[in-house]
Amino acid sequence: MNLKLTLAFVAATVTTAAVAQNNILDVRENYNIGDVVTVTGVVTSDDNLGSVRYLQDATAGIALYPGADWGDWDATPQIGDSLSVTGEITEYNGLLEVGPNLTAVDFFGAGTLPEPLEITPAQMDESLEGQLVRINGVTFPLAGTFITGNSTYDFNAAGESGVIYVRTSNTLVGEELTGCEVDMLGIVSQFSFDGFGGYQLLPRGPVDLIPASALCYTSPVTQTNLATTSFTLSWTTDLACDGTIEYGLTEDLGTTATAVTGNTPSHVVNLEGLEPG
């Protein structure tokens, strides 16, 4: 008896592909290190923050890290670009990133930049990591310091304190931290060896430090050369200008003295011919 045996082989092909996510918040909350995801949004940073770009949609923000640069892709993302990126989720010193293992970068033209979220320093945490924010009423304790690259600087606002980080590539390098109050924009980032805390703000150049007033004092008015009928007042401002003093024996004042220093940031006024008592 002849037996005819027919064997059927079924080949199954499994394709691994990234599933497009609904939003960046979904990626941040529901996916793990090593997962491949696709995120879409608007770029909020440029070379001032190095090769890293920050991407934000209506729900959250996230860092994109291409490695050394964006040379493998059609272009280098700039602020305002709308794009979609597919890659592996990684973490660098607490900062959640997509990359450097990127498999697709698609540009969609100009997007609509998100409005910076107004916060206080203490609100910089994981929920805002990767987002563009604004902190008003900022002052820097180290007034008179010139910014250097790869450095951090403390700041104060709303009775709270925070830290900014400035890379060598940032155009803030060489700028002076004055004693003037500013409203500051930047991206909330994180640098922590154990992954906890270490939140810092990343301003994207001088444009992100907005003076709170057109002119401000960088030193208080001081009195010197005190004599029976005269004394000297001196002070400094952030910009060059003419300095004057009004004085008198009543609320109406009535007498004006002009600084002898002229149109400069340093002002000196000599008040003479005064009456003792």
Question: Which residue ranges define each predicted feature?
Answer:
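Intrinsically disordered, low-complexity segments enriched in glycine/proline and serine/threonine
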Residues: 7, 21-24, 249
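N-terminal signal peptide c-region/cleavage motif recognized by signal peptidases
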Residues: 15-16
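Residue-level marker of positions within ordered structural domains that often coincide
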Residues: 8, 60, 191, 240, ...
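Bacterial N-terminal signal peptides that target proteins for export
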Residues: 1-7
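Residues embedded in well-ordered secondary-structure elements
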Residues: 9, 30, 76, 126, ...
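Extended non-catalytic accessory segments flanking core domains
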Residues: 20-217
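Short, surface-exposed linear motifs at loops/turns and structural transition points
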Residues: 214-277
